[in-house]
Swiss-Prot record:
This is Cannabidiolic acid synthase-like 1. Its cofactor is FAD. Keywords: Disulfide bond, FAD, Flavoprotein, Glycoprotein, Secreted, Signal. The FAD cofactor is bound via a bicovalent 6-S-cysteinyl, 8alpha-N1-histidyl FAD linkage. The lineage of its organism: Eukaryota, Viridiplantae, Streptophyta, Embryophyta, Tracheophyta. It comes from Cannabis sativa.
């Protein structure tokens, strides 16, 4: 009996030693173990395609930085991935998930790299980036008016290929052509057609998602709850989106636009803004009228640097010049819109015009510019967003605009963007994005700058603006938009047992009453919280399952 007990103890000790040794080896060499695991997912017939980049690879930094759109996150101290995977197909995504789980690495998934807080390519723990640049096909079915869009496609590529197949079809998504479809669609995604057709996420009819077990799911196999969650609730919370099936929408053969600049004192400008905020959301959905204000540094007659504000009122109208001018003169005569202020453009040229890649006086638009994934000049930036449910008083509006003159602004911009139209008709719970009826407009606060040593100064400026506007925007909670992610709203401490309580603070700002349903979906499909970040949807603790 004694011998048996001793032998059992001795054998257990040996087993424990080898298990501990293997665990230590695994922990000590997560990159090596990941690569060994992942090698089985690399096809033997692919010789020229580069799928894997490690920190010793000569192209590692160029691949990493190529789609980092916010230069705040390119410093030497920014956490870097152990490995970057650029999958060619879904099997490589499956392999990355399974191997990352096996060796204890986190995953960040990057489509276009526009995450405002860099969370598609930054983690505070050892991690792998899945960079979807190679998965960017857009397959159009004109007959059914649908398309399959791989998650690595940019909005520019989506618009280009739809237009190539049919000039009277498009898709309701954002303005910036280098934004990736993977993240944009899964966070909501709004743009020029929002008041006509809703968000990008409102027009998704199927998806391919790779889940925590490495299985590829479509709408039928994932079920309606998970399909609901990934359309506005952040697909990265539940897996990796490989592709979306989207519903295409009708657009006019020609649209009419104007973008008029107003040079006037702020007190006079605010009178126009006040009129705008009371009528823009009430227009018929065929008219989008928005306004924005941007700082410009100029040199005055004495050679001194001076900050000035350029103010613009801009439109997209589904109709002709005469109809637009007549409508504006009746409803907003203070703007003084004339025929000479207007341009008639095809829909694809309208997209290019407002993409920011051409100037106002351009007379010829080459749509191939939408295929350029480089994004042009980049800068460091910070962005916040608010929803406005009642008119901001003129005195407060004066102070808000005057903040653009403050020393620490860098290049500052405020955009006032109207809601209304079909957005008033869609239920708050139709998808996780809850911002619908009752919202007059949203405000974007943006600061951009060149030097990384100025980061804190400019970030503090935008925080001060945000704090000032607190009494004038949505309340209880102060709502926010997932695609303009803001870590100032809160972060989850994964060591804390109160993940849900922490996440609820910011979760209800992004998702309102939909947050709890997202938590239930997360608990069901990823109970161990493998897909996580500082603002991910948490699963409920085991006792609450």
């Amino acid at each position: 009996m004694k011998c048996s007990t001793f032998c059992f103890w001795y054998v257990c000790k040996i087993i424990f030693f080898f298990l501990s040794f293997n665990i230590q080896i695994s922990i000590a060499n997560p990159q090596e173990n990941f690569l060994k695991c992942f090698s089985q997912y690399i096809p033997t017939n692919v010789t020229n395609a580069k799928l894997v980049y490690t920190q010793h690879d000569q192209f590692y930094m160029s691949i990493l930085n190529s789609t980092i759109q916010n230069l705040r996150f390119t410093s030497d101290t920014t956490p870097k991935p152990l490995v970057i995977i650029t999958p060619l197909n879904v099997s490589h995504i499956q392999g990355t998930i399974l191997c990352s789980k096996k060796v204890g690495l986190q995953i960040r998934t990057r489509s276009g790299g526009h995450d405002a807080e860099g969370m598609s390519y930054i983690s505070q723990v050892p991690f792998v980036i899945v960079d979807l640049r190679n998965m960017h096909s857009v397959k159009i079915d004109v007959h059914s008016q649908t398309a399959w869009v791989e998650a690595g496609a940019t909005l520019g590529e989506v618009y280009y290929w739809i237009n190539e197949n049919n000039e009277n079809l498009s898709f309701p998504a954002g303005y910036c052509p280098t934004v990736g479809a993977g993240g944009h669609f899964s966070g909501g995604g709004y743009g020029a057609l929002m008041r006509n057709y809703g968000l990008a996420a409102d027009n998704i009819i199927d998806a391919h998602l790779v889940n925590v077990d490495g299985k590829v799911l479509d709408r039928k196999s994932m079920g309606e709850d998970l399909f609901w969650a990934i359309r506005g609730g952040g697909g990265e919370n539940f897996g990796i989106i490989a592709a979306w099936k989207i519903r295409l929408v009708a657009v006019p053969s020609m649209s009419t636009i104007f973008s008029v600049k107003k040079n006037m004192e702020i007190h006079e400008l605010v009178k126009l803004v006040n009129k705008w905020q009371n009528i823009a959301y009430m227009y018929e959905k065929e008219l989008l009228l928005f306004t924005h204000f941007i700082t410009r540094n100029i040199t005055d007659n004495q050679g001194k640097n001076k900050t000035t504000i350029h103010s613009y009122f801009s439109s997209i109208f589904h109709g002709g010049v005469d109809s637009l001018v007549d409508l504006m003169n009746k409803s907003f005569p203070e703007l003084g819109i004339k025929k000479t202020d207007c341009k008639q453009l095809s829909w694809i040229d309208t997209i290019i015009f407002y993409s920011g890649v051409v100037n106002y006086n351009t007379t010829y638009f080459k749509k191939e510019i939408l295929l350029d994934r480089s994004g042009g000049r980049k800068a460091a930036f910070s962005i916040k967003l608010d929803y406005v449910k009642k008119p901001i008083p003129e005195t407060a509006m004066v102070t808000i605009l005057e903040k653009l003159y403050e020393e620490d602004v860098g290049v500052g911009m405020f955009v006032f963007y109207p809601y209304g139209g079909i957005m008033d008709e869609i239920s708050e719970s139709a998808i996780p994005f809850p911002h619908r009826a009752g919202i007059m407009y949203e405000i974007w606060y943006i600061a951009s700058w060149e030097k990384q040593e100025d980061n804190e100064k400019h970030i503090n400026w935008i925080r001060n603006v945000y704090n000032f506007t607190t009494p004038y925007v949505s309340q209880n909670p102060r709502m926010a938009y997932l695609n303009y992610r803001d870590l100032d709203l809160g972060k989850t401490n994964f060591e804390s047992p109160n993940n849900y309580t922490q996440a609820r603070i910011w979760g209800e700002k992004y998702f309102g009453k939909n947050f709890n349903r997202l938590v239930k979906v997360k608990t069901k499909v990823d109970p161990d919280n493998f897909f996580r970040n500082e603002q991910s949807i948490p699963p409920l603790p085991l006792r609450h399952h």
